[in-house]
Design a protein with these regions (language model features):
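Short, hydrophobic-biased segments on the C-terminal half of alpha helices
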Residues: 97-98
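Conserved segment of winged-helix/HTH DNA-binding domains
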Residues: 116-135
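Alpha-helical residues within the helix-turn-helix
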Residues: 84, 101-102
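N-terminal leader segment of winged-helix/HTH proteins
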Residues: 1-58
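N-terminal helix-turn-helix DNA-binding core of bacterial DNA-binding proteins
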Residues: 46-88, 117
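Alpha-helical hinge/cap motifs
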Residues: 59-63, 112, 123
C-alpha cells in the first residue's frame, strides 16, 4: 500500500525542487497515512452489524420487491396479498419475510390466523434515500 500511495503522492507533488522532492514525498506519505488512519477509525465506529444485515437483506430481488410493495401499499399486507404479486412459492415468500423481520426492516403482526407485515421507518428511510439519489 505504501508504494502505491507514494506513487500517487509523487504524481500530485509539483511544489518541490529536485533536492527536496524525496523529503517532501516522505512527509506527505506520513501525513496522508495519518489522515487515512483517522478516517478508518471514524468509519469503524459507524459500521454496525445490524446495518450490514439490513443492507444485505435488500440485495435479494424477492426481498427488495417485498419492501417496495409494502412501502408503496402504505398499509400492512398479509402474505396472501403479497403472494399473487411475486413469482415465488409461499414458502419462499414466508422465508423472505422472516429474513426482513429479523433484520428490522418489516414489522410482523399476527391477527387471528393471519400474519400482516408493514415496513419499518428505517426501511422507509432507506427506500426514500435510494429514490432520492437515483439518476
Amino acid at each position: 500500500m505504501n508504494d502505491r500511495l507514494r506513487r500517487l503522492i509523487a504524481d500530485e507533488i509539483d511544489c518541490c525542487d529536485a533536492e527536496e522532492i524525496d523529503q517532501c514525498r516522505r512527509a506527505n506519505v506520513e501525513e496522508r497515512l495519518n489522515v487515512l488512519q483517522d478516517l478508518k477509525a471514524d468509519t469503524k465506529d459507524r459500521i454496525h452489524d445490524e446495518d450490514l444485515r439490513a443492507v444485505s437483506k435488500l440485495g435479494n430481488e424477492t426481498r427488495y420487491t417485498i419492501i417496495r410493495l409494502l412501502v408503496a401499499a402504505d398499509k400492512d399486507l398479509c402474505v396472501c396479498e403479497l403472494e399473487p404479486l411475486l413469482d415465488v412459492s409461499v414458502s419462499a415468500l414466508s422465508h423472505a419475510l422472516s429474513d426482513l423481520s429479523s433484520a428490522g426492516l418489516v414489522d410482523r403482526q399476527k391477527r387471528g390466523r393471519w400474519r400482516f407485515y408493514q415496513p419499518t421507518e428505517r426501511v422507509r428511510a432507506l427506500v426514500n434515500a435510494i429514490d432520492a439519489t437515483r439518476r
